């Protein structure tokens, strides 16, 4: 009550905003007469004038009235379309980074041209996002005429385009595309090895069409790029028998030598080959054709074979059947070492699982591994400014505000709505409901009134189609199976007597025009004459008037959707631009929503009345019961999205750190200093395990350190001799000496290639190592996410446990990147530039050629997370990387909130 009184006194927030926008509309209208007097060249020159103003520091808000007036005038000249005042308001809402709720038929496609033009003047690009490729291509071509007239370029990104084509599209002033394609291109850019492979140039301003569908309905599952993990079954098969020919040796700590072919480190579950073992393995690999005579395992082109050798050694010597794993249904299933339970679906990494499969003679499974992943929430929140349009956003206004900081503004219609929304009819069962729909359609179609029947599934659309065929009712069906015919079917749906069956989402973005789509009819003719066009227009006017007289488009909903928004979208197909129309939903107690949520009161009442199958009830209590059910489902789905976002925010913080550092590394010409810092860090960490900080010499394990340096980094240093020769070689000086000697050896090795080749090689090794370890980390994070809920049974908060464990895993990921990068560069043998070329060629061959871009259909939250586990020569300046966050000093607190210094946490790679 008090709120209503307050609104009467001061007006609602929406009304106050509209009042403010109308003042701008008056300014724009005042310019219309003067701008209509300008020549085409004078109007086009306004674009350069606006750009010069912006360069002088004038804000976009200041030039908005003039810019909108220019676009309106260009629309009249180029397309014969004038922006209504309400469309100007819609454009202002979008420019301010809000959601513009405009009813179907209010011309949202034309509305987008206003803020798109204004924001493109800054030169930073505008992305216009649609729900499918057809609409993206159509709108880019259609609205591109207007932008081109004003001197701006337009691009469209579509699935299947080459990198060159996409780069050109993203470099345009205004780029159209689908939500999936923008998201996948962002992920692909952050998987690129070379800067020139990237296609995007940042996230500046986005206008999302059908924003409720994209940011709400499709936000329950992440975008995933996946590919085969390590499809090298033949290598595992060839390695399998080699291991059996090796003999276990023992370490002699006094002589610092090892007998046999390998030694076992039980503590770390690792196998180390002796010099003799290396020679024997190389000889065996020559025999099976994996090496040529005289080749070394540590040659640049062969070094990756060590992974398969190590995996086979570990599979045979460290992992025992019925202790570490079992073989069940011809598959290797891991046994949890702490609980003894089977861990179905979990697989060891680094090729170990495939090696065990080869050992046991079961099929070696080709795995799909997640390469990159992001949710729509976290992708779209990267834009400096985000806006959206839809006919149905107000019901989700709270979620838009809390998740995306987007305010919903309801824009008034250009003409007063005349649609009549009739009460729902509820039947006892589906058969009675469908029979009633058929009867209604059969009667109405005789009058010449067009009908659109909306269904929630393809299956129901086909059932209704077969019933219509039996009754001899001519009709068209629009569902996913007729996607290519979508525009044609929708174009005819407003003709007199037309009957169209459509799934709820099909055809969104294309208006149903009463009398049929005049523009498409004219476009279908080859070089039509003026007389033909005049005749088509006259015929269309007759059809249009006939349909208006019959009551406009009738929309029949065959069942209620879980979301009120989807129902409102279906209703919105009728009554566009002040046209008449009528809508009604036909329901049954067998419908999913009614069966799951409708109150027993409704069901019992219908039974007591003794209603028959083909009789319907029409009552306010039924409508309220349905609305309560829909609100319950909406809350459930909102909770799912919030839960997904809460967990993904943890991954997102890590993703931002990795992608930002990766992009900075890609822009660096010379990473040698970074490599030196990584080597220093790895050696310091290694030394800490054998020479604890602050310890005395008697506590040092010098032999262990010598062995570790030799096995892990190929560094044979006589540390014991150094200590004998120099009694002043204490902990700190010893550390400095080892680091200096390691650096000198590395530089001598790299001296055989020129500096440019060396820098290129070092950067590629570092980036590929980051990518490899990031993939492993993503899969580990996914596994953690799937099972963390079990912590709840131990009275622990799963989210807090997930956050803490994820932080530990991220630190381990950074350590692995450092260690593997240093190990690869230390162990690799470089004789000349040819070896570098061989290494690069090998990496290209091992990189999956076909990566799968996948956005799973929205399911429950657990299903969504389970699913998550699953040629260009261009100027690199076109895709310049922009730092997303302020530069952090190495001694500053880490922005991730760990409490550590940046250099000791997320800055380890830099």
From Swiss-Prot:
Topology within the bilayer: Peripheral membrane protein
Keyword terms, alphabetized: ATP-binding, Cell inner membrane, Cell membrane, Cytoplasm, Membrane, Metal-binding, Nucleotide-binding, Protein transport, Translocase, Translocation, Transport, Zinc
Binding site for Zn(2+): 894, 896, 905-906
Keyword Nucleotide-binding: yes
Protein name, entry field: Protein translocase subunit SecA
Compositional bias (Basic and acidic residues): 880-890
NCBIfam families found in the cross-reference section: PRK12904.1, secA
SMART domains the record matches: SecA_DEAD, SecA_PP_bind
Subcellular location, record wording: Cell inner membrane; Cytoplasm
Enzyme class: translocase
Chain's gene name: secA
Biological function: Part of the Sec protein translocase complex. Interacts with the SecYEG preprotein conducting channel. Has a central role in coupling the hydrolysis of ATP to the transfer of proteins into and across the cell membrane, serving both as a receptor for the preprotein-SecB complex and as an ATP-driven molecular motor driving the stepwise translocation of polypeptide chains across the membrane.
Cofactor note: May bind 1 zinc ion per subunit.
Single GO BP term: protein import
Main localisation: membrane
Required cofactor(s): Zn(2+)
